[in-house]
Curated annotation (Swiss-Prot):
InterPro entries associated with the record: Class_I_gatase-like, GATASE, Imidazole-glycPsynth_HisH
Superkingdom to which the source organism belongs: Bacteria
PANTHER family linked: IMIDAZOLE GLYCEROL PHOSPHATE SYNTHASE SUBUNIT HISH (PTHR42701), IMIDAZOLE GLYCEROL PHOSPHATE SYNTHASE SUBUNIT HISH 1 (PTHR42701:SF2)
Binding partners and assembly: Heterodimer of HisH and HisF.
GO molecular function: glutaminase activity; imidazoleglycerol-phosphate synthase activity; lyase activity
Pathways involved: Amino-acid biosynthesis; L-histidine biosynthesis; L-histidine from 5-phospho-alpha-D-ribose 1-diphosphate: step 5/9
The protein, known as: Imidazole glycerol phosphate synthase subunit HisH
Pfam families, per database record: GATase (PF00117)
Amino acid sequence: MQTVAVIDYGMGNLHSVAKALEHVGAGRVLITSDAKVIREADRVVFPGVGAIRDCMAEIRRLGFDSLVREVSQDRPFLGICVGMQALLDRSEESGGVDCIGLFPGQVKFFGKDLYEEGEHLKVPHMGWNQVAQAVDHPLWHDIPDLARFYFVHSFYIDAANQRQVVGRGHYGLDFAAALADGSRFAVQFHPEKSHTHGLQLLQNFAAWDGRW
């Protein structure tokens, strides 16, 4: 039976993610902060919620920045929400925070003056929204284009390499909803809260060989 490590650095909706992975038959799911267990896992999930400064402080304190770089190179790796944002170069949250830098780009604030067709939009972006599939990727298998996923975020990803953008969202402006590079896949939305389509994505991740 394969092992899926859900990285625990004290910030994240870990049990919901783990339960969803178990529900789709992902194998032995371990919530862990043990570097040895993470290194030995067949797949790795990197969730996150909260302020990026606090997240990055814990990630660096535990040495998980280098660990994430290492384990995401040679096995299926999934970043979720702030776990996705932490993979970028830098976030402008909290006055500016350097991140892990696996995906080139910036994490930017939606702003207080966000409008769509004259309507003022509330920030954070919270609720269901469509994701346009920019390319065909194994994790989109059996998920229709423009399927709706559940989002909660005040900061969005402005990707520097558009070829890595595999899913796009729109909330007053266009943003990267999903990024991919080799065995790495990352989503801004919460698949564990996104019902049928979110569970399908997790099931696809559990079956994915990491190739793209």
